């Protein structure tokens, strides 16, 4: 019985970590896109 609760907690924790990683990747990609858009403007 305790094993099931531990497994559920572990799965929820993994899902939460994956969610955080996805958010960080999206923010990182978004910041890179913004830099790519700003760089040509400053160069020209």
Curated annotation (Swiss-Prot):
User: Keywords in UniProt for this one?
Assistant: Host membrane, Membrane, Transmembrane, Transmembrane helix
Q: How does it sit in the membrane?
A: Single-pass membrane protein
Q: Which organism is it from?
A: Severe acute respiratory syndrome coronavirus
Q: Give the UniProt subcellular location, in the record's own words.
A: Host membrane
| Residue ranges that the Swiss-Prot or TrEMBL entry lists as coiled coil | none
**The organism sits in which domain of life?**
Viruses
User: Quick check: keyword Aminoacyl-tRNA synthetase in the entry?
Assistant: no
Q: Decide whether keyword Transmembrane helix is in the record.
A: yes
The regions listed as transmembrane in this protein's record are: 9-29
A GO CC annotation recorded here is:
membrane
* Full protein name: Protein non-structural 7b
What InterPro entries does the database record attribute to this sequence? NS7B_bCoV, ORF7b_SARS-CoV-like
Its predominant location is host cell
Q: Name one Pfam family in it.
A: bCoV_NS7B
């Amino acid at each position: 019985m305790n094993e099931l609760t531990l497994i559920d907690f572990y799965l929820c924790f993994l899902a939460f970590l994956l969610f955080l990683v996805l958010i960080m990747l999206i923010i990182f990609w978004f910041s890179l896109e913004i830099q790519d858009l700003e760089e040509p403007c400053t160069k020209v």
